[in-house]
């Protein structure tokens, strides 16, 4: 999508912390990437920050809704305000909606002519191995994508098509399964946080990940490697998102190993970080 619509010299606005490719791909094309930081206390952002950055060179705003790694979910009011900011410039809003369906129901492509929605079976459907996804946008954008596709993947394989069709046919059951797992694990996190005051987390209303903050003087990559080596528990370190003293916590696994992993994190802290 970015390689199709963006050109060297275009300006792109990205929200951070966020998915690395949203920043690095435009940079590789030669775009000027401007960053807007989410507020740490609630992982939200106001439209005013976007308005200040907009100009005639702003080709695209890139969002993840809900966000990876924070779980941020943008409201319909926020999206409508952002659309009004973008309209005078014809700016695209590219929104990765890979977690859509758990809670967030508004798709940017349904409410904005230059809105582009991308999604896949990787997250909510737990079928990342299929590498199956889709794009929804206006006719011009889809036509440009089809032209580029002729020089890359051409089409998906018939087996992937079939398995994807089966998954989508049973989407209600699969989404309900995901909702139940995540709801249970969020409750586990809430109880765990009560017993571990040196950690805090804004639990998301949507999505399958959250950003766990810790209050120890230990860089996140070192912390993650030590924890993995000693306890066999892995978190994505916040340094991967240019945000130290955080871990990305995935909420979508079976509850028993999920709780066990948090308990091992507590044990590691008790053994090494609390004197």
Which stretches of residues belong to each language-model region?
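Phosphate-binding glycine-rich loop
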Residues: 1-11
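A short helix->loop->beta-strand "cap" motif at the edges of active sites that frequently abuts
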Residues: 10, 31, 88-92, 113
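Hydrophobic residues in well-ordered beta-strands that form the structural core
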Residues: 14, 35, 62, 93-95, ...
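Helix C-cap/helix->beta junction micro-motif
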Residues: 29, 88-89, 196, 231, ...
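Active-site phosphate-binding strand-loop segment of PLP-dependent enzymes
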Residues: 38-104, 109
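PLP-dependent enzyme catalytic core of the Aspartate aminotransferase-like
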Residues: 52, 217-218, 225-235, 241-275
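Conserved core segment of the aminotransferase class I/II
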Residues: 116-183, 187-192, 263
């Amino acid at each position: 999508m970015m390689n199709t619509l963006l050109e060297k010299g275009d300006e792109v606005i990205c929200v951070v912390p966020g998915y690395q490719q949203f920043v690095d791909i435009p940079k590789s094309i030669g775009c000027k990437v401007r960053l807007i930081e989410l507020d740490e206390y609630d992982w939200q952002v106001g439209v005013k920050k976007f308005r200040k950055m907009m100009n005639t060179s702003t080709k695209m705003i890139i969002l993840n809704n809900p966000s990876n790694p924070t779980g941020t979910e943008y409201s319909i009011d926020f999206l409508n305000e952002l659309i009004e900011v973008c309209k005078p410039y014809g700016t695209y809003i590219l929104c990765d909606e890979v977690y859509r369906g758990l809670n967030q129901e508004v798709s940017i492509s349904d409410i904005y002519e230059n809105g582009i929605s991308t999604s896949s079976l990787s997250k909510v459907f737990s079928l990342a191995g299929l590498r199956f996804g889709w794009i929804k946008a206006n006719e011009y954008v889809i036509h440009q994508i089809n032209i580029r596709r002729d020089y890359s993947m051409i089409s998906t394989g018939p087996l992937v098509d079939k398995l994807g069709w089966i998954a989508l046919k049973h989407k209600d059951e699969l989404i309900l399964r995901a909702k139940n797992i995540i709801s249970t694990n969020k409750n586990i996190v809430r109880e765990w946080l009560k017993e571990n005051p040196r950690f805090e987390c804004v639990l998301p209303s949507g999505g399958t990940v959250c950003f766990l903050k810790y209050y120890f003087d230990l860089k996140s990559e070192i912390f993650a490697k030590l924890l993995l080596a000693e306890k066999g528990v892995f978190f994505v370190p916040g340094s991967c998102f240019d945000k130290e003293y955080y871990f990305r916590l995935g909420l979508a696994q079976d509850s028993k190993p999920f709780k066990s992993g948090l308990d091992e994190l507590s044990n590691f802290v008790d053994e090494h970080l609390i004197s």
